[in-house]
């Protein structure tokens, strides 16, 4: 998944 910095972990699959 993807997330915004400071909101979600910046991890990508």
Curated annotation (Swiss-Prot):
Keywords: Hibernation
Superkingdom classification of source: Eukaryota
GO biological process: hibernation
Known function: Up-regulated in CNS of active, non-hibernating snails suggesting involvement in the regulation of hibernation and maintenance of the active state.
Protein name: Activity-dependent peptide
């Amino acid at each position: 998944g993807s997330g915004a910095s400071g909101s979600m972990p910046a991890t990508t699959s």
